[in-house]
């Protein structure tokens, strides 16, 4: 099986069309900008600090998380299959003076010559956009050093997540373009843990994220019934 087969061309095209608005704080990616400080803090705190560490951001898109990790001292590589988002990411990094290496490649292909290379790997809101999440998770595991951390975020699959992320965020609040998400591709925490358990990763922590449309604020929650992140660590 070729490594580029774990790509959904429609998903790539979807984010290519939105690339030019990636760094518009009030544009289509506003939710990612609002959510990013929580993600960055969770990654930095759970991994024991990422300053000076080699970090790979899988599915980096336009570089929102990648840049924030680089700003606090991580050595960041960003990986994506969308050429337009990567061009936006490279340009923005030049404008802001942040040193990041952006690569157009799949996680599976990149892992071939980066076995045990990174201290931390992040894979945020990406698993629900690929045909084979297990393949991506394995590649992330292969690329992190023993004892290193891999972080995943995705969306639970249930009635509440459908109401909040699709009916609410896409149709009612217009926070995201209609069609951004496919509820059938959402992943239950139990399913994600099972996929992780098929690798040398061990789940160390899980946290939910909730959004208050009245205040426009994201915050952590112990509930993982909609958006959630998990922290995993590779067995030594």
Swiss-Prot record:
Task: Give each disulfide bond as a residue pair.
Answer: none
**What EC designation does it have?**
2.1.1.222, 2.1.1.64
Catalysed reactions, semicolon-separated = a 3-demethylubiquinol + S-adenosyl-L-methionine = a ubiquinol + S-adenosyl-L-homocysteine + H(+); a 3-(all-trans-polyprenyl)benzene-1,2-diol + S-adenosyl-L-methionine = a 2-methoxy-6-(all-trans-polyprenyl)phenol + S-adenosyl-L-homocysteine + H(+)
Show the CDD domains listed in the entry.
Answer: AdoMet_MTases
Alphabetically, which GO biological process terms does the record hold? methylation
Q: Which UniProt keywords apply?
A: Methyltransferase, S-adenosyl-L-methionine, Transferase, Ubiquinone biosynthesis
Record bears the keyword Transferase: yes
N-terminal signal peptide: none
Q: Does the keyword Methyltransferase apply?
A: yes
Provide the top EC class: transferase
Q: Which pathway does it operate in?
A: Cofactor biosynthesis; ubiquinone biosynthesis
Pfam families in alphabetical order: Methyltransf_23 (PF13489)
UniProt xrefs under InterPro entries: SAM-dependent_MTases_sf, UbiG_MeTrfase
- From the UniProt record, which GO molecular function terms apply? 2-polyprenyl-6-hydroxyphenol methylase activity; 3-demethylubiquinol 3-O-methyltransferase activity; polyprenyldihydroxybenzoate methyltransferase activity
> Which residues are involved in binding S-adenosyl-L-methionine?
39, 59, 80, 124
**What does the similarity note say?**
Belongs to the methyltransferase superfamily. UbiG/COQ3 family.
Q: Which NCBIfam families does the annotation name?
A: UbiG
**Summary of the function given for this chain in its UniProt record:** O-methyltransferase that catalyzes the 2 O-methylation steps in the ubiquinone biosynthetic pathway.
Q: State the name under which the record lists this protein.
A: Ubiquinone biosynthesis O-methyltransferase
Origin organism of this chain?
A: Shewanella putrefaciens (strain CN-32 / ATCC BAA-453)
């Amino acid at each position: 099986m070729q490594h580029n087969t774990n790509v959904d061309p429609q998903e790539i095209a979807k984010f290519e069309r939105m690339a030019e608005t990636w760094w518009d704080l009030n544009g289509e990616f506003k939710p990612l900008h609002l959510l990013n400080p929580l993600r960055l803090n969770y990654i930095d705190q759970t991994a024991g600090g990422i300053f000076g560490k080699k970090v790979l951001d899988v599915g980096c898109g336009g570089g929102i998380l990648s840049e924030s990790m680089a700003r606090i001292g991580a050595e960041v590589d960003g990986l994506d299959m969308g050429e337009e988002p990567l061009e936006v990411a490279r340009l923005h990094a030049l404008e802001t003076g942040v040193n990041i290496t952006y690569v157009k490649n799949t996680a599976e292909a990149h892992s071939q010559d980066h076995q045990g290379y990174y201290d931390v790997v992040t894979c945020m809101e990406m698993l629900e956009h690929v045909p084979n999440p297990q393949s991506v998770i394995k590649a992330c595991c292969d690329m992190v050093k023993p004892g290193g951390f891999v972080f995943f975020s995705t969306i639970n699959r249930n009635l509440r997540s459908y109401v909040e992320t699709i009916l609410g965020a896409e149709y009612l609040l217009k926070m995201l373009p209609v069609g951004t998400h496919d509820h059938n591709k959402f992943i239950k925490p139990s399913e994600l843990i099972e996929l992780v358990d098929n690798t040398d990763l061990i789940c160390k922590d899980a946290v939910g994220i909730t959004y208050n449309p009245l205040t426009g604020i994201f915050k952590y929650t112990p509930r993982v019934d909609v958006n959630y992140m998990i922290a995993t660590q590779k067995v030594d």
